[in-house]
Amino acid sequence: MRNIIYFILLLLFSFKGYALETINIEHGQAAPTPIAVNKFNIDSSADYVLGNDVVKVISNDLKLSGVFCPISSASFIEERTGIEYKPLFAAWRQINASLLVNGEIKKLESGKLKISFILWDTLLEKQLAGEILEVPENLWRRAAHKIADKIYEKITGDAGYFDTKIVYVSESTSLPKIKRIALMDYDGANNKYLTNGRSLVLTPRFARSADKIFYVSYATKRRALVYEKDLKTGKESVVGDFSGISFAPRFSPDGRKAVMSIAKNGSTHIYEIDLATKRLHKLTDGFGINTSPSYSPDGKKIVYNSDRNGVPQLYIMNSDGSDVQRISFGGGSYTAPSWSPRGDYIAFTKIIRGAEGKTFNIGIMKAYPQDDENRERIITSGYLVESPCWSPNGRVIMFAKGWPSGAKAPGKNKIFAIDLTGHNEREIITPEDASDPEWSGVLN
C-alpha cells in the first residue's frame, strides 16, 4: 500500500526464552491463546471513537482466526494505556492473558494517523513485536488488519491474511433476481458493487496483483464476454469473446497467462491464453468435459476436473498439457479444484449421490501424496457447499454454502470460511445472497 509508510519499532527485549510455543495451525484444533487487546492511548488530536474501532477490528481479526481468544475489556485490571511504559504483567496474568497488545494513535500535522503497537508475552514479561504505521485516516481499518497480521505471524509462524479482499457474486433476495460482482474486505466490511446488474455475471477472479479482476458476463444468453476491471480506476475492457466459456480464467503465478475451459463441438477442453498476444493454446484432448483449471503456485502444473472416465475426477498435468495423472479415486464426483498458495494441498467440491439425494462436501487432498497417505479429508458438508478458494497463507478456505427453502427460509446462499483442519467454520456477513468467492493476496 503506497500510502502506508512503515517504521519498524526497535525491540526492547530479547525474544529468547519465549514462553508460548509457536502454534501449529495445521494439525488439529488447539485451545485458542488468551490475548488482551488493551485500549489504545489516543492523543487529543485523534478521534477517540476511531481509536476504539481500531481495537475492535484487531480483536475481531484475532478471534475469527480461531488461534486467539480476546479477553473482554471489562475484566482488565490495569488502567494505564499506551506504549510508553512497561505493563504490570502480574495484573494481566491474573486475568489469564498470555499475550497483551498495547498501542497508541496520534494525528500528525499532515492529517495522517500514526498508529503504534507492542505485543507482549505476559509470562516471560518480554516484548515480542512492535511497529509504527503512518496511514491516511480513511485507511485506518487496513492499518488495524496489518497489526493483526503481525500478531498472527509472530505467534503462528505463518503470514497473516487479514489485510485482504474478497470478490464474489451478489444476488438480490427479492424478485427479480439481480446478480452483481461485489468486493469486500475479508471480514465482510466495506462491501461495494462493481457491476450494475443488467447482465448475468459469473466467477470473478483476481489478477495476481489484486488491483484487477476478471469475470464472465453474458450480454446475451449465448454470448459470453470476459471482462477485465481495474479496481483503482474503475475502467473496464473486454479481454475476449469466448463462445462456450463457463468460468472466468485463472491466472498463472507470473500473471502472463491464464487457463480457462471452453466448450466446442460437444466437448469442453482446457485452454491457455497468452494475455499479451491473446493467443489460445489447447491443453486437453479427447471427448468429455474438462473444466475448472487451477495453476500450482510455481506455475508448472495445472489441476482440473474431467469426466473422461464417466464420473468427474481430478487430474494434474504439466502446464503444457503433458503428463496427465489422475489424483482422486474416491466415490462421488469431484469438481472445482483449487490449489493452495503453499502448494501442499488442493481443495475441491465432492458430490455424493445417495438414496436421500445429493450431499455436497468441501475437502482437501495432498497435491503429491505418498503411497501410504490418505488422499483426501472432508472438512465440511451440507445441502450445497461449493466453490472453495484459499487464503493467501494457505490455512483457511472460503466457500459458498446454500440452504433449501424452509431451512433458512427462503433458500439462501452465503459465504463461509473454515480452517483447513475442518474447525472454526464461520459466516462472512454480506448484504445479500453471495456465491463464487475469490480471495485476493495480501494487499500492498
UniProtKB/Swiss-Prot annotation:
Main location: periplasm
Function of the protein: Part of the Tol-Pal system, which plays a role in outer membrane invagination during cell division and is important for maintaining outer membrane integrity.
Organism: Rickettsia akari (strain Hartford)
PANTHER family reported for this sequence: PROTEIN TOLB (PTHR36842:SF1), PROTEIN TOLB HOMOLOG (PTHR36842)
Gene Ontology cellular-component terms listed: periplasmic space
Cell cycle in keyword set: yes
Keywords (A to Z) from UniProt: Cell cycle, Cell division, Periplasm, Signal
SUPFAM superfamilies: TolB, N-terminal domain, Tricorn protease N-terminal domain
Signal peptide positions (record): 1-19
Stored InterPro entries: 6-blade_b-propeller_TolB-like (IPR011042), PD40 (IPR011659), Tol-Pal_TolB (IPR014167), TolB_N (IPR007195)
Keyword Cell cycle: yes
GO biological process: cell division; protein import
Top-level lineage group: Bacteria
Pfam families: PD40 (PF07676), TolB_N (PF04052)
Entry's family note: Belongs to the TolB family.
Positions in coiled-coil regions: none
Binding partners and assembly: The Tol-Pal system is composed of five core proteins: the inner membrane proteins TolA, TolQ and TolR, the periplasmic protein TolB and the outer membrane protein Pal. They form a network linking the inner and outer membranes and the peptidoglycan layer.
Compartment(s) where it occurs, according to its Swiss-Prot or TrEMBL record: Periplasm
Protein name: Tol-Pal system protein TolB
